[in-house]
């Protein structure tokens, strides 16, 4: 669902905090916004046209090259606080 920035960041902070608990329950997070890939998320799967486009460790997959190919347009990924941010070139 499309949360406003404040609500989104609150939800992501709760997920990040809960992931650090000793008895943390693994979770799958589905999003269209790469900036929502929090530090607790270690691996990603990118889907395109209903098929797996790429999967693996987030730092290996969320790159300028992979995302530019997937989105069919030039993009740049900037990492800030272990979170990726997408910039359209």
Predicted feature locations:
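Helix N-cap at the start of a conserved alpha-helix in ABC-type nucleotide-binding domains
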Residues: 5-7
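Conserved catalytic/dimer-interface elements of ABC ATPase nucleotide-binding domains
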Residues: 45
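A short, surface-exposed alpha-helical micro-motif characterized by mixed small hydrophobic
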Residues: 37-39
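ABC ATPase nucleotide-binding domains
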Residues: 70-89
């Amino acid at each position: 669902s499309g949360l406003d920035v404040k609500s989104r960041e609150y939800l992501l902070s709760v997920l990040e905090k809960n992931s650090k608990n000793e008895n943390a329950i693994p979770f799958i997070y589905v999003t269209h916004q790469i900036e929502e890939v929090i530090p607790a998320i270690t691996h990603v799967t990118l889907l395109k046209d209903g098929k797996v486009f790429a999967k693996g460790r987030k730092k290996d997959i969320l790159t300028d090259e992979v995302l530019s190919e997937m989105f069919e347009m030039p993009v740049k990924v900037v990492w800030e606080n272990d979170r990726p941010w997408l910039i359209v070139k």
